[in-house]
């Protein structure tokens, strides 16, 4: 066992304009090469553009867009016996779901074909708000692949049954010995 003390998780401060934790997480996801002021500028400028287009509170639009892009499960790879690798879907906490949704939105915004990143992010947020766009499609792909869960449950239940059979055989052997 290590003798090091466990580090406490750093609490992320809310952003200065919208006073929202979700916004500060998004700014940190946009961040590249340590230039946080540029990341803030990109996000706030895209929110201003959204406000001009929709004439609504941009924070509400952004929260709805993140809600539409959040998957209910997460796919993870698992190694089984004999080197088999399979994907298993796992239910995740709300905090983790939001992080995944932000990753989907920002990565799909970077792949868009608009002129600059501000327009790309603005377009992806509006698309996610309207339940269209690459981020929502990625969420739907993950939710369609829930079938590996059932395969995993069958695999686990077969192993449990076989262990019970082995235990019964051992008990019979012990009874025969005495």
UniProtKB/Swiss-Prot annotation:
Family that this chain belongs to: Belongs to the universal ribosomal protein uS7 family.
Role, per record: One of the primary rRNA binding proteins, it binds directly to 16S rRNA where it nucleates assembly of the head domain of the 30S subunit.
GO MF terms held by the record: rRNA binding; structural constituent of ribosome
GO CC, one annotated term: small ribosomal subunit
Chain intervals for the UniProt region annotation (Disordered): 137-178
Entry-linked InterPro entries: Ribosomal_uS7 (IPR000235), Ribosomal_uS7_bac/org-type (IPR005717), Ribosomal_uS7_CS (IPR020606), Ribosomal_uS7_dom (IPR023798), Ribosomal_uS7_dom_sf (IPR036823)
Alphabetical UniProt keywords: Plastid, Ribonucleoprotein, Ribosomal protein, RNA-binding, rRNA-binding
Record-linked SUPFAM superfamilies: Ribosomal protein S7
Pfam families registered for this protein in UniProt: Ribosomal_S7
Biased composition (Basic residues): 155-178
Ranges of biased composition (kind: Basic and acidic residues): 137-146
Subunit composition and interactions: Part of the 30S ribosomal subunit.
Entry protein name: Small ribosomal subunit protein uS7c
Localization: Plastid
Biological-process GO terms, alphabetical: translation
């Amino acid at each position: 066992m290590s003798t090091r003390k466990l580090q406490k998780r750093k609490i992320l401060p809310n952003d200065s304009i919208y006073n929202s934790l979700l916004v500060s997480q998004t700014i940190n996801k946009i961040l590249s090469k340590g230039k946080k002021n540029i990341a803030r500028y990109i996000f706030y400028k895209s929110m201003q553009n959204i406000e001009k287009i929709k004439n609504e509170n941009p924070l509400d639009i952004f929260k709805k867009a993140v809600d539409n892009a959040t998957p209910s499960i997460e796919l993870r790879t698992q190694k089984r016996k004999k080197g088999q690798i399979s994907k298993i879907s796992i239910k995740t906490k709300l905090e983790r779901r939001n992080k995944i949704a932000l990753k989907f939105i920002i990565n799909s915004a970077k792949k868009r074909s608009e002129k600059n990143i501000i327009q790309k992010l603005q377009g992806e947020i509006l698309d996610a708000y309207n339940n269209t766009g690459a981020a929502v499609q990625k969420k739907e792909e993950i939710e369609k692949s829930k079938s590996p869960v059932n395969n995993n449950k069958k695999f686990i239940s077969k192993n449990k049954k076989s262990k019970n059979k082995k235990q019964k055989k051992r008990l019979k052997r012990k009874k025969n010995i005495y």
